[in-house]
Amino acid sequence: MKVDQKGHTITIKDTQGDFTSFLDKVSQSKTAFDTHNVIIDLSHNPSVTLADLKLLLPLAKQHKKLKKSFVVVAEGIDFNAVPAQLSVVPSNLEAHDIIEMEEIERDLGF
């Protein structure tokens, strides 16, 4: 797991390719990321499935309650099948764009 911080955003990358152990590490350290927007970068793990992404829903919901963004970067996923509560995009650039838009919405009171 690799963690990069840029401004109010933390990017967490899966470097091992083992989603289960990655999810455990992220879940154990979730309180350290509560004050930041989070990007979960799974783009280097082609074996990630929709079922795996759904395991991130509790983390995403908790983060949204704290008025912070939670975006997942994954490739090879049917984006139409992803639950609406989970933001999944195909690239890091789009993840940063989603966070910017959500911050503007929060600033405007939406």
Regions found by a protein language model. Name each.
Residues V3-K6, T11-N37, L42-F110:
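Amphipathic, Lys/Arg-enriched alpha-helical "gate/interface" segment within cytosolic domains
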